[in-house]
Swiss-Prot record:
It catalyses: aldehydo-D-ribose 5-phosphate = D-ribulose 5-phosphate. It comes from Bartonella quintana (strain Toulouse). The gene is rpiA. GO terms for cellular component: cytosol. The active site is at E105. Signal peptide: none annotated. This is Ribose-5-phosphate isomerase A. Catalyzes the reversible conversion of ribose-5-phosphate to ribulose 5-phosphate. One of its GO terms (molecular function) is ribose-5-phosphate isomerase activity. Its EC number is 5.3.1.6.
Length: 234
């Protein structure tokens, strides 16, 4: 089975956790896209749900497949957030944001009673950091913000490139109008300390470390198994 097939299987399993009249957080990324498509099929069959999308792209996809969507302003409390991850590490700590929606993804996850992660087995790791950590920053004073990020990394013994994410010849811009630095630090042994230190930098809007938010992960395995993992399983 290829990776795309595994993503579809994880997304299909996630539908078993969705019930009528649920208020759903709907994620962003390739695995979330598969979930949206399958959710649309269930809605067409009569499932009643309302979603809050974590990006403009996911909202457009929901509308395309017939999934009713609203905003957090209209529905500030959600029952279940279903989203992918770039890495799933110990104690269900995640790296997210490869799709550029990390700020909204974290807001929606925090507004949800539970967060369910859907992924293929390649996303499960013993130590976070092989995937670049996205750091969303305000465009104002970016060189100063970058310097402070580098200082945080140095203080925590992290080394590696910090690269401004590009979209062609221009910086990639998030739905919130911010830019993203991708930090290639390789191995993040103290994610909570790093999280706190990054958020203490005034120019940092958010980062892609998620801890204390996900309660379960559905992981599709290459051998055909689908595992439902709790934080205690890591």
């Amino acid at each position: 089975m290829n990776v795309q097939q595994l993503k579809k299987r994880a997304a299909a399993k996630a539908l078993e956790f969705v019930q009528d009249d649920m208020r759903l957080g709907i994620g962003t990324g390739s695995t979330a896209n598969e979930f949206i498509r399958l959710l649309g099929e269930r809605v067409a069959d009569g499932l009643r749900v309302t979603g809050v999308a974590t990006s403009q792209y996911s909202e457009q996809l929901c509308r395309k497949f017939g999934v009713p969507v609203t905003t957090l302003e209209q529905m500030p409390e959600l029952d279940l957030d279903i989203d992918g991850a770039d890495e799933i590490g110990p104690e269900m700590t995640l790296i997210k944001g490869g799709g550029g929606a990390l700020w909204r993804e974290k807001i929606v996850a925090a507004a949800s009673r539970a967060m369910l992660v859907i992924a293929d087995e390649t996303k499960v790791v013993k130590t976070l950091g092989a995937f670049a950590l996205p750091i969303e920053v305000n465009p104002f004073g970016m060189p100063a913000t970058r310097r402070l990020i580098e200082k945080v990394a140095d203080d925590l013994g992290l080394s590696g490139e910090i690269i401004l994410r590009m979209n062609g010849e221009n910086p990639f811009k998030t739905d919130g109008g911010h830019f993203i630095f991708d930090a290639f630090w390789g191995c993040i042994l103290q994610p909570r300390l790093l999280s706190e230190a990054l958020l203490a930098i005034p120019g940092v809007v958010e980062h892609g470390l998620f801890w204390g938010l996900a309660s379960r992960a559905i992981v599709a395995m290459a051998d055909g198994q689908i595992k439902v993992l709790e934080s205690s399983d890591f």
